[in-house]
Amino acid sequence: MIMNKFKRFMFCLMAMFSVTTLSAQSIYDFTVKDDAGNDVSLAAYKGKVLLIVNSATRCGFTPQYTELESLYEKYAKDGFEILDFPCNQFGEQAPGTIKEIRQFCTGKFNVQFPQFDKIEVNGANEHPLYTFLKAQKGFSGFDTNDQRGKFMDEMLRKRDADYDKKSDIKWNFTKFLVSRDGHVLKRYEPTDKMEDLEADIRALSK
């Protein structure tokens, strides 16, 4: 009896979650937690060009923090923001608390852009924001003519031959570019060239 009630409760909860995510019109419909655990409505970023990234501190792509901070310093005056969400799902490369992660990033890379609480971006516990982001822009593949892209493709295909048919986030430092009206414009894999990303940011920042 108790178990049946629990199952019904969980079913209703999941249904509510699905409806909320599917009914979202833009990223402004979502709330996240900042690095102090406070709720932050993404509606606070209306009118900004946003880059949303899932990060890690012990990844081969971690040096991208330097390039991201450079972009932030260059375009922040034009209404550009980076929203960083540490995630420990890929090789457990984002260990520690959000406070420890923040200290590492500010100390080593002088990161000034907002960093939010750690989240999951794939699976049963993924944050609704990422469910929405992936629904808007799925995975379009790695550039296998690029050495890093080829490596990622081979590594992930060994784990799952059909990995490229799923919209899941593939690795740390996947990025989503969001327009000033909250719509997801483009997805960048961690191996994509930062100069291409900057060109898109520059165009939106005019």
What are these regions (language model features)?
Residues 2-11:
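Bacterial N-terminal signal peptides that target proteins for export
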Residues 10-21:
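Bacterial N-terminal signal peptides
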Residues 22-43:
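N-terminal "domain-start" segment that seeds a small globular fold
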Residues 48-49, 57-58, 62-86, 105-109:
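Conserved helix-turn-beta segment immediately C-terminal to the redox Cys motif
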Residues 79-96, 112-123:
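Thiol-based oxidoreductase modules, predominantly thioredoxin-like and allied folds used
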Residues 110-189:
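Thiol/selenol-based redox catalytic cores and closely related redox-interacting motifs
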Residues 186-205:
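Non-catalytic, surface beta->alpha helical segment in thiol-disulfide oxidoreductase systems
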